Structure formats: C-alpha cells, structure tokens
Swiss-Prot record:
Domain SH3 residues, every copy: 337-398
Any one annotated GO CC term: plasma membrane
Annotated region (Disordered), positions in chain: 145-167, 213-327
Family of the protein in this entry: Belongs to the SHO1 family.
Biased composition (Polar residues): 220-235, 266-286
Predominant location category: membrane
A GO BP entry: filamentous growth
Protein species of origin: Candida dubliniensis (strain CD36 / ATCC MYA-646 / CBS 7987 / NCPF 3949 / NRRL Y-17841)
SUPFAM superfamilies for this protein: SH3-domain
Protein name as annotated: High osmolarity signaling protein SHO1
Compartmental location: Cell membrane
Length: 398
C-alpha cells in the first residue's frame, strides 16, 4: 500500500477534482498577489494557504490508496475550507473594486464549488445516489481496467496452466471432457465444455461402460493381457505430455489386484497424476489449477460405477474419508498468496454481469491481495475467490 502515482491516475474522480482544485487555487493566489494589500482581507491569506494543504492531503491519500480510511476526517477538514472560501468571496466582492480582489474572488468561488463536491462525496454513503453516480465513472469504468494487472492476469495465468498441462483427465476410452461445473468459482469464464484429451468426440455410453470394466484397448483402464482379474494401470499421463512408468503395477498375469475387493476395478498410482486431481495424499504433486475433486486418501482403486464422462468426476465408494473442499492457493500451486486481511465495512452484492466479483456481508473477514487499485483480489472464508471494491472493506493490522 505504498505511494504510487498509478493509484492517483487510475481514478478519474481524483484526477478531475484535484486538477480543478489546483487551477482554482492558482487563480485565487494570483489575484491575491496582484491586489493592494491595504484593501485585501488579510484573513483570506490563511484561507488560501489552508486550501492548498487540503488539496495536497487529498492527493497523497489517493496516491497511497487509503483515501477510504480518512473520509470522515476529510469531511471536517474540507468543511472548514468551505467556510474560508465562501467568507473570502463575500469580502472580496463587496468590499473592494480592485481587479486583483475580483480575480481572487473568482478563484475562491471555484474552490467553494470544489469543496462542496468533496463534502458530498466523502460524507456520503457508498450506496447513496451521489456516490453511485460518481463511482460509475471511477470504480466501474476505471477500476475494472486494473484487473489487467491483477485478477485478469491471474485468469491469464490459469489459462496458460490449462494450455501447458492440457487439463486432461480421461475417464474412459481416451476422450474425456470437463464441464463448467468442475471448475472453481473463480473460473466461470469457461462457458462450454472443454475437450481434455485432445480428441474431437465425446465418450459414448458404451465406451464409458467398457472403460469402467477395463475392456477398451486404448482406454486408461484397458485390459491387454486377457486376464479379467488384472487391470493394467495407465501408461500415459493425465495432464502432461510425459508418460510415467507405473510403480505399483503387477505385471504377473497370474496374480490379481489386491487393492480393491472388486476384481473388475482398475487402479492407478500417484505417479500417473499431475496434480489436477487434488488428492489429499501428500505424495501427489499440487501443480494443477485447483479443480475440486471428490477423491479419497486411499485412491488406488476406483469403483466401476463411479465414472461420469460428462463432468469428469471420480467417486470412490470403498472409502468414506472424502475431501470435498475448495483448495487454498498454497495447495493448488497457482502462486497467489493473500498477504492481507480486510474487514467488510458494508454488505456488497456482486454484479451478476461480472463473473469476477464476489458478494460478502458486513463485518465479514476477507483475505485480500493486489491492493493497488480500486478493486482488490479477495478470498472469502468459504474459499470463493474474486474481486471486491476497495471502498467497501478496510485493511486489518496483522
């Protein structure tokens, strides 16, 4: 939350009001300097000096991106400046005919208008009509553009992860798909199913049935030995292009698989996985994109009735110790670390037209990061990740 001009230039309201204030102040100080000091109200010098201090304070607060923390203080300070400028205007107009005094009065009128705008904005509730109108230009218009350096970059990184790993986890005869329902809440941009294994055809019900009993020659659970009691493990990779050598495979065709009570059920080892499956086992690498899977600790065997080719979900009914949670970023390997905690000052309902926004309630504690703009990347306690408006939350000391 350090000083950065990007925080100031990224807010059109800040640029317009501070720039207008500086120009108005220059007009006022020029008129005061050119006036005859015998007829110029001496107290107006203090009002003009006080005004430039207020303008500089507001600029610094915007540049440090903590303007929301001092809004109530600014209302009091700007109200004092409003009294000074309006009083100076009255004295300069009616008590003197000096051109310099009239020029200073014009500058004070402009400063009075600016101070009134600041009082209405800083003193108004974020959901008030005036604030909503002003924020429609700054927060909605400019704030979402900052996602290019924050949340949208995160989406782009996830897209790259999808491309590099091919995001495939075939469940049947080599062609599997993963639908929108299998993605984390932050990845709703995928509106249509994605062909995972690179094929062009979706698996048929017959291929899924054959795959579940390991009778497809090119499927991941194919039985190439002719022994119905032995299911060959996968020889390809789920997410990458490198094949893995099975470590728990029994190549003796006279032996049977002992990892499952069902002899017709294939098995796979952790060496065949790339992290997209999010097993709870610590031996499985977590370099995927954080897909939520219904998997168990003891996942060496798969139930032959639990293959769902439409969604890519895997169930294991032999073990009830399941993990059905949205994984943290440290587990998914996305590289995102939420370094700060923030408390919601108000309740917020996400815009239904923006899939990146998240809703939250007043006093809710959020984990936030990328706090350099009007919109911060945030994660709720339930694991939902998205963006939230910075003026609705307050950073907490940790």
């Amino acid at each position: 939350m350090g000083f950065s001009l990007l925080n100031f230039t990224g807010d059109p309201f800040a640029i317009s009001t501070v720039s207008f204030g500086i120009m108005s102040w220059v007009v006022a100080i020029a008129g005061a300097a050119s006036s005859k000091q015998q007829t110029f109200p001496h107290f107006s010098w203090w009002g003009i000096s006080y005004q430039i201090v207020i303008i500089l304070i507001i600029f610094v607060l915007y540049a440090n991106n903590n303007i929301e923390l001092y809004k109530f203080t600014l209302v009091g300070l700007v109200s004092i400046a409003f009294i000074y400028t309006t009083n100076s205007t009255n004295n300069l107009i009616y008590n003197s005919n000096s051109p310099g005094n009239l020029c200073c009065a014009a500058g004070c009128i402009l400063l009075s208008i600016l101070n009134l705008i600041w009082i209405l904005y800083f003193g108004g509730h974020p959901e008030s009509p005036t604030n909503q109108f002003i924020d429609s230009f700054s927060i909605r218009g400019q704030g979402h553009e900052q996602l290019g350096s924050g949340s949208h970059n995160h989406n782009h990184n996830l897209n790259n992860a999808n491309t590099n790993t091919n995001t495939n986890m075939p469940l049947g005869g080599g062609n599997g798909i993963i639908g929108k329902s299998e993605l984390s809440p932050y990845d709703d941009r995928f509106a249509s199913p994605i062909n995972i294994s690179g094929g062009t055809n979706q698996p048929t019900s017959e291929s899924l049935r054959l795959a579940s009993v390991g009778q497809m020659g090119n499927g991941p659970f194919s039985n190439t030995t002719g022994n119905p009691n032995l299911q060959q493990p996968l020889t390809g990779s789920f997410g990458g292009s490198t094949n893995h050598t099975p470590t728990n495979a029994n190549t003796n065709t006279n032996t049977t698989t002992t990892n499952n009570n069902n002899n017709n059920t294939g098995y796979m080892t952790s060496s065949h996985l790339t992290g997209l499956e999010n097993f709870s086992s610590p031996n499985v690498p977590n370099n995927g994109i954080g897909l939520t899977r219904d998997l168990t600790h003891n996942s060496n065997s798969l139930n032959n009735n639990s293959h769902n080719g439409a969604t890519g979900s895997i169930n294991n009914s032999n073990n009830t110790n399941k993990r059905n949670t949205i994984y943290t970023d440290s587990e998914t390997g996305t590289g995102i670390t939420f370094r700060y905690k923030a408390k919601a000052l108000y309740s917020y309902d996400a815009n239904p037209d923006d899939i990146n926004e998240i809703s939250f309630v007043k006093d809710e504690i959020l984990e936030v990061d990328d706090i350099d703009g009007k919109w911060w990347q945030a994660r709720r306690a339930n694991g939902q990740v998205g963006i939230c408006p910075s003026n609705y939350v307050k950073l907490l000391d940790t």
